[in-house]
Amino acid sequence: PTNHGITTWIGDRAGGAWRGTRRNDSHLPPEYDRNLRASEITLAEVMKKAGYKTFFAGKWHLGSKGSWPTDHGFEINKGGWDVGSPRGGFFSPWQNPNLESGPAGESLTLRLGRETADFIEANKDKPFLAYLSFYTVHGPIQTTPELWKKYQGKATAAGLAKERFLFDRRLSVRQVQDCPIYAGMIESMDDAVGMVLKKLDQLGLADNTIVCFTSDNGGVSSGDAFSTSNLPLRGGKGRQWEGGIREPF
């Protein structure tokens, strides 16, 4: 639902989007959709009509074939399809019909950053919309051995918390960011964002380009490997507390 809201700039329920664990609630009418409706006007469609070259890279998760990025205003699609997590994991070869696998072990996150930077360079002399939607930090939680070693033990050495988990009602919730794998994923995403910003600087486009950075939900602090903590905010992904819905923008 949040991806839908970012793509169309309207409320997800107003647009018919719903994602829940149960479908038998009497308050949820059956017309809620799994695909982004063809009738919805996306940001890409508006920009394309205004003469912008439009590009999408990464996680789409807004419908099956027939409702992919190229069906909703994006002229180029690198990696966007049905699923919300990367099939095959974060290292090549991956199982993605819209992104050719690179050399064995290539980072998906860095590849998406490079694809976006390459698109910007190819279209530096015309207006463009580049929408980079990382699969990171969705599961599976994976990083390189080098990054794992870099962050392993840092939380303990820093004395961030004595109790790693707290029981919140019926949920066991992570209380400290001490997952070295998750930290490695964040660094990879930072590097990929850096590729894009560096390319804008190199081409002299930084002062004439609007860059927006946001997220679709809080980190997973319960279940799914308890990958991170959102303290001092309560809760995380899938919860209506601030840890699940308060995002950077």
Q: Model features per residue range: what roles?
A:
Residues 9, 13-24, 60-62, 66-68, ...:
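Active-site-proximal cap/lid insertion segments
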Residues 1-3, 51-55, 75-81:
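Short, structured active-site-proximal loop/turn typified by the sulfatase FGly-forming signature C/S-X-P-X-R
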Residues 1-2, 42, 54, 109, ...:
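Ser/Thr-centric signal marking residues that sit
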Residues 4-61:
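Long, well-ordered early-domain segments
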